[in-house]
Curated annotation (Swiss-Prot):
Keywords of this entry: ATP synthesis, CF(1), Hydrogen ion transport, Ion transport, Membrane, Thylakoid, Transport
Record family assignment: Belongs to the ATPase delta chain family.
Compartments where found: Cellular thylakoid membrane
Keyword match Ion transport: yes
Protein's name in the database: ATP synthase subunit delta
Gene Ontology MF term list: proton-transporting ATP synthase activity, rotational mechanism
Gene: atpH
A GO cellular component entry from the record: plasma membrane-derived thylakoid membrane
Length: 182
């Protein structure tokens, strides 16, 4: 991953600086999240863009058609620049690094919450307050995931901290405790 960071960080940093100068940082970060979700959900798109068979001009035309009305002009320029430099295959890593730099700059902690079932808005708000207290931060971004294997409850990952309040985790800990006793 360090080699990939060596490639992606300059693009992410430069794009963040451009967005700051144009006062559109929050907007481009939201767009980056949307484009990243599309990129990850559509392997055909990412595969075609990474393909050496497809010519650069065709890639740029496709990017123009797909994203012209969806992203800022500076974001579209980043996409075309990555295509020009044969780096569009690492777009996901560039956008992830951009979002990471944005969070660092704004002191936003990232928490991944995996629950057994969908959480209501009320549960999410209560969980956000508790996780903010545990993470000791004013700003928190929560990434929600569903994993029915947890049976019930949830698991929270914030930085290096893990809070396992799942039924599966309790069963595992009970099994370990019983194994020690016998």
């Amino acid at each position: 991953m360090p080699l990939l960071n060596t490639i992606t960080t300059p693009y992410a940093e430069a794009f963040l600086q451009v967005a700051e100068s144009r006062k559109e940082v929050d907007q481009v970060v939201d767009q980056a999240k949307a484009v990243l979700a599309l990129w990850n959900d559509c392997p055909e798109l990412s595969g075609a863009m990474a393909s050496p068979v497809l010519e650069v001009e065709a890639k740029k035309a496709a990017l123009q058609k797909l994203f012209a009305n969806q992203v800022t002009p500076s974001f579209l320029n980043l996409l075309k620049l990555l295509a020009d430099r044969q780096r569009i295959g690492v777009l996901d890593a560039v956008l992830e690094r951009l979002i990471e730099l944005y969070r660092e700059q704004r002191n936003i902690a990232l928490a991944t919450v995996t629950s057994a079932a969908e959480l209501s808005e009320q549960q999410q708000a209560a969980l956000q307050k508790k996780v903010q207290a545990v993470a000791n931060t004013d700003k928190l971004e929560i990434n929600l995931k569903i994993d029915p294997d947890l049976i019930g409850g949830f698991v929270v990952n914030v930085g290096s901290k893990v809070i396992d309040a799942s039924v599966a985790g309790q069963v595992r800990r009970l099994g370990l405790a019983l194994a020690k006793v016998s």
